[in-house]
Amino acid sequence: MSDPVFIAPKGGLTLGSVAEACGVPLPDGADPAQPVTGAAPLETAGPSELAYMDNARYGDALATTRALACLVSPRFAPRVPAGTIALVTRDPYRAYAGLLARLYEEAMRPGSLFAAAGVSPGAHVHPQARLEDGMRIDPGAVVGPGAEIGSGTVLGPNAVIGPNVRIGRDCSIGAGATLTHALVGNRVIVHPGARIGQDGFGFAMGAGGHIKVPQVGRVIIQDDVEIGANTTIDRGASRDTVVGEGTKIDNLVQIAHNVVIGRHCVIVSGVGISGSTTLEDYVVLGGQVGVVGHLRIGMGSQIAGSSNVNRDVPPGSRWGGTPAKPVRTWFREMTTLARLAERGGKDEAEG
């Protein structure tokens, strides 16, 4: 549940303003002036709070909810109880996300741990760093020579910004994160502990020992990217590692040198992407997916969790398994194996 001690909802919202923001019409008889004080799950929502429902599993919770209003798809609208206003939309979850963004604006981007604006006396900023007005740097943060940081950006405690790194406006760099050899766009969120721009894993291997290959590329992070806690993004060997506009990367992801990730991709926790692989726009990688190097995953493709991708994936594909293959083929193989295993067990019992 939300706790105002940590994140307080925005005041002054009404049912009418919320419905307008979500692009949902109010039904006849609903009072647009009714105050909205928060959002909560169906089971706990109170008479001044909003909820949403888009899964038949929660039908019982919908039937007993006390919420002021509920965002629902046309399919579930008839099941909304009489005491709750049905706000009908084709995508309840997306509308609910818009509602939460209005109610809890401060949760949209991690802020400074300290109320004071400007540079904390406990931070270490090199005299040759260039800082725009209106930013915040928390105690323990380090900013190297030649670094540029835009207005509205927040550096958390003990964040380290290396020499000549450029960070755009309205970004959030979490506590203990490190950025070197990187160019970062606007409205980028880097969560605590992330490591961006360190050496890629490059060695010329041989019987006489392994020779380190200098990694002289950069990391380019475009606008509106979000990078999860303890994720690591290596800089390029000779070309750049790139993360495209609007891409969202979960916690504990490893992105190797020279990887190019397109726009609006989604990469879930535990993924590892080997060097020089390209993800085109709108690719989704489920949790713990492994991708070998020098591949191309086509635009709009989706890879099921725990899969291992060892060859190129055509655009618009849905693949899964180890090694990954089209989902229909994978399911058919799994079904066949299950039947063979069951038949083998019966044969052993009869024998």
Swiss-Prot record:
It comes from the Bacteria. It catalyses: a UDP-3-O-[(3R)-3-hydroxyacyl]-alpha-D-glucosamine + a (3R)-hydroxyacyl-[ACP] = a UDP-2-N,3-O-bis[(3R)-3-hydroxyacyl]-alpha-D-glucosamine + holo-[ACP] + H(+). Gene3D superfamilies: Hexapeptide repeat proteins, MurE/MurF, N-terminal domain. The active site is at H257 (proton acceptor). The keyword Acyltransferase applies. One of its GO terms (molecular function) is N-acyltransferase activity. Its EC number is 2.3.1.191. The keyword Repeat applies. Keywords: Acyltransferase, Lipid A biosynthesis, Lipid biosynthesis, Lipid metabolism, Repeat, Transferase. PROSITE patterns: HEXAPEP_TRANSFERASES. Pathway: Bacterial outer membrane biogenesis; LPS lipid A biosynthesis. Pfam families: Hexapep (PF00132), LpxD (PF04613). GO terms for cellular component: membrane. One of its GO terms (biological process) is lipid A biosynthetic process. Homotrimer. Belongs to the transferase hexapeptide repeat family. LpxD subfamily. Catalyzes the N-acylation of UDP-3-O-acylglucosamine using 3-hydroxyacyl-ACP as the acyl donor. Is involved in the biosynthesis of lipid A, a phosphorylated glycolipid that anchors the lipopolysaccharide to the outer membrane of the cell. This is UDP-3-O-acylglucosamine N-acyltransferase.
